[in-house]
Curated annotation (Swiss-Prot):
It is a single-pass membrane protein. PANTHER family: SEC61 SUBUNIT BETA. Residues 1-42 are annotated as: Disordered. The chain crosses the membrane at residues 62-82. One of its GO terms (molecular function) is guanyl-nucleotide exchange factor activity. Pfam families: Sec61_beta (PF03911). One of its GO terms (cellular component) is Sec61 translocon complex. This is Protein transport protein SBH2.
Length: 88
């Protein structure tokens, strides 16, 4: 009878080390941000409107608040108007 080799051993350890090194290499090669991956687009985007260096459109936060609340009230008013006009 031939002596059987126990499970595991040097070949398994070598395969595990090789798989671990492949994973480490892939982790080092993948970009960590979307800008590095090429998904960021150009740097002259809509975010330039909100930077201090931009010559873009500047709106005070209070104006944005009033406009958004006014929009919400107009939508509610239109819903109520259509609800009451369909009853009559």
């Amino acid at each position: 009878m031939a002596a059987s080799v126990p499970p595991g051993g040097q070949r398994i350890l070598q395969k595990r080390r090789q798989a671990q090194s492949i994973k480490e290499k892939q982790a080092k090669q993948t970009p960590t941000s979307t800008r590095q991956a090429g998904y960021g687009g150009s740097s002259s985007s809509i975010l330039k409107l909100y930077t201090d260096e931009a010559n873009g459109f500047r709106v005070d936060s209070l104006v944005v608040l009033f406009l958004s609340v006014g929009f919400i009230f107009s939508v509610i008013a239109l819903h109520l108007l259509t609800k009451f006009t369909h009853i009559i």
